[in-house]
Amino acid sequence: MQFSKMHGLGNDFMVVDAVTQNVFFSPELIRRLADRHLGVGFDQLLVVEPPYDPELDFHYRIFNADGSEVAQCGNGARCFARFVRLKGLTNKRDIRVSTANGRMVLTVTDDDLVRVNMGEPNFEPSAVPFRANKAEKTYIMRAAEQTILCGVVSMGNPHCVIQVDDVDTAAVETLGPVLESHERFPERANIGFMQVVKREHIRLRVYERGAGETQACGSGACAAVAVGIQQGLLAEEVRVELPGGRLDIAWKGPGHPLYMTGPAVHVYDGFIHL
């Protein structure tokens, strides 16, 4: 099986063309391939499939390193767009794809960045899903013997965003896994730790569902900005500084889609016998 290794700000992927190859991935195989000592090593596996709708170009599937399939990965979407162009699967700059829960448009810019229409953030608890009696801008949660204030949003996948004074000292390794599996998130959640530098700039670390802390999380950056704007903390255009680098997020508020712009890097091509 041929594959490519790619990354978006250090969030790394194994990308496989299932348009011209016949492939099947069991959870066990994915876990083996994801092992950084015994396999290829990656945060997520991205699979390019033929479209199910003639109006679309491709179907986009995402698997976490633990073998679970998820519906959204922003950094992966940028790598997906670069991959299908690099491999000659399309020469379009505007690439329309379906995912497990919707559709996306990926745009390759003139300076080789990728701009992704991530859709409109959904703050309804049932959409996340998150157990709450009604939608709030801020929720109070109990975890690890602490009282935590957070915002909750779906970017096609579930996110919880906590504001911290300093991301460098935030309890990502200890609080992240506790909140990821909290009973109020029946499908688990990605946990973002956000430091507001100013209205146009945040620093962010994300403990990803099924992957742990990564160098960058695109949908996590979108979620943090969406929550920050909803809570009145941020402007409509925000620079997000992650351990792996920078993303630019723009959202005009309810009724509008949110846009993420950032890089996607091809590292190498490989072949593996399964």
Swiss-Prot record:
Site Important for dimerization: give positions: 268
Question: Which biological pathway?
Answer: Amino-acid biosynthesis; L-lysine biosynthesis via DAP pathway; DL-2,6-diaminopimelate from LL-2,6-diaminopimelate: step 1/1
Protein's cellular compartments: Cytoplasm
Active-site residues, record numbering mapped to chain: 73 (proton donor), 217 (proton acceptor)
- SUPFAM superfamilies xref list: Diaminopimelate epimerase-like
Which terms in the GO cellular component ontology are assigned?
Answer: cytosol
| Gene Ontology MF: a single term | protein homodimerization activity
Cite the EC number. Answer: 5.1.1.7
Q: How is its activity regulated?
A: Inhibited by 2-(4-amino-4-carboxybutyl)aziri-dine-2-carboxylate (aziDAP) and iodoacetamide.
Chief subcellular location equals cytoplasm
Q: Name one GO biological process term.
A: lysine biosynthetic process via diaminopimelate
User: Into which family does the record put it?
Assistant: Belongs to the diaminopimelate epimerase family.
Quaternary structure, from the entry: Homodimer.
Protein name per the record? Diaminopimelate epimerase
User: In the UniProt record, what gene is named as encoding this protein?
Assistant: dapF
